[in-house]
Amino acid sequence: MSLPGLELSQTSSEREFVPAPPTQITLSKGSEWRFEVAFGTAIRVKLLAGTAELFGTELAASQTYTFSGTKAAIYTWHGCTLEVSAGDTISTIDGLGSGGLNGEGARGYGAGGCQSEYTAEETPMVEYANVHFALEAMRQEAKATGKDGPRVLILGPENAGKTSVAKILTAYATKVGRQPIVVNLDPAEGMLSVPGTLTATAFRTMMNVEEGWGSSPMSGPSAVPVKLPLVYFYPLQNPLEAEGAVYRPIVSRLALSVTGRMAEDEDTRETGIIVDTPGILSAGKPGSLEIINHIVTEFASSERLYSTMMKNYDNKPTSSASAAASDERITVVKLSKSGGCVDRDAAFMKSVRESQIRTYFFGNPIPSTASAALSMSASSTTNITLSPHAQQLDFDSLAVYNYTIASSDEDEDEYDPSQFGASDTFLPGGRNDAEGPETKHAEETSFTSSVPGLGGPSGDDAASGSSAVPLKKVLPPAPNTLANSLLAVTHTAPNASPAEIRDASIMGFLYVADVDSEKGKIRVLAPIGGRVPPRAIVWGKKWPGEVVGLVG
């Protein structure tokens, strides 16, 4: 604004950023443009000439794509020309300004405001394409002989491009009419779900260029057909927690569901499975190889990892039931790491997780002209805005369970003042005399069944190993640490055994916005209206952990 008489102007936040004119980038055949965009900022990319793809999904000509909070690469087989320009500042929900998540959002000095961008001539895309053609040959053989299609397990260290390879192979398969099942076994990032989940999805249509894997069902239109993921909750940071005692059974349950789907769907059986794994399994830590063995048995890049895989699995027979009477063999192939793979620090990954959770409840705030064109919308841009339903619940009416596993990298303090307001610990005998013997026995049973190594109730539950499942029911009053965390609503009954709760798939997620321990109520956000179904609920206390600022 101007100061009268002095012809001076005061800078304002609205005038600080002046977008640079669009930049044209010409790529020769076999090269790719690599770029990084911070959260809270956006760039727009348009394909002016030639052909190009992002992680295997082809870009439409003359359509503008918007990217925010991503590290990606656009590859061309025959050469192309791109136009890159600065996008609008992303306004997040409830006053988290243009700075984005975790204080990020600094616009860079690259084309369109990229934090980093450059053109690379050497890429491993030819290797990835050769893998696709080899898989296609195996799929054609599977169709001719009636066998199962190839099952691909992708292993490698952190930030090696495993998920990128999975996207490329999936995109190429769908492009030729195949229908692969993609399995995500990495709880650090969600695939069509929130972090802390293990998912399996059958891909029948193209993936979304701007959103990666695409989107799951929602109450609204979608330019790209939605995907239907099968979701299991694993509220721990990595598979090695509790020596894999929780991770392995969930993987087995997920593999059983995938096997059942393939038995009923001829197209997915012929196409096969693509499994993406966490990088920590390839770091050589104790217990990693056992979990890899388990994954190979159920679903069946470093030199040391490659040598171990060659020694243990190359040309060895598979263990699947369908291969029992055949001569199927496991083949180990080493792929080059792309030079575009960059390290994703803890702050960036935290922003990724918060963005996935925010998108689950509130939709995608990034305006997209490409989606508007695909959806035949009258507006020039479109963004998907969802309205979650807020409601208060009596904590007493909920069956909330929590995994009682000490973190491997820190000693967690379980102290919560709300648990000691009306405690009966200091009464004679440490127990309320008004309680009957039935209540005492129920509490003893609950405690015994939640601690590994202690004898649980006899019968079927004991036989199934329920006493070894480190799940404990959270008793009233509601702990204050419940605020700003996720609750996973399972498909099993609230009084189910710990093993049944652990192995149950997920119906949906709730976000705890506030906790009133005195009144025994919690305020939650739900993706749909109506009463919360009477199901067992698992608390994501340890992972994905606390998400602050989702609501005001």
UniProtKB/Swiss-Prot annotation:
Coiled coil: none annotated. The keyword Nucleus applies. GO terms for biological process: mRNA 3'-end processing; tRNA splicing, via endonucleolytic cleavage and ligation. Residues 459-468 have a biased composition (Low complexity). Pfam families: Clp1, CLP1_N, CLP1_P. Disulfide bonds: none annotated. It is found in: Nucleus. The keyword Isomerase does not apply. Keywords: ATP-binding, mRNA processing, Nucleotide-binding, Nucleus. ATP binds at residues 32, 71, 159-164. Its main location: nucleus. Residues 432-444 have a biased composition (Basic and acidic residues). InterPro entries: Clp1, Clp1/Grc3, Clp1_C, Clp1_C_sf, Clp1_N, Clp1_N_sf, CLP1_P, P-loop_NTPase. GO terms for molecular function: ATP binding; polynucleotide 5'-hydroxyl-kinase activity. Residues 409-470 are annotated as: Disordered. GO terms for cellular component: mRNA cleavage factor complex. Component of a pre-mRNA cleavage factor complex. Interacts directly with PCF11. Required for endonucleolytic cleavage during polyadenylation-dependent pre-mRNA 3'-end formation. Belongs to the Clp1 family. Clp1 subfamily. This is mRNA cleavage and polyadenylation factor clp1. It comes from Aspergillus fumigatus (strain CBS 144.89 / FGSC A1163 / CEA10).
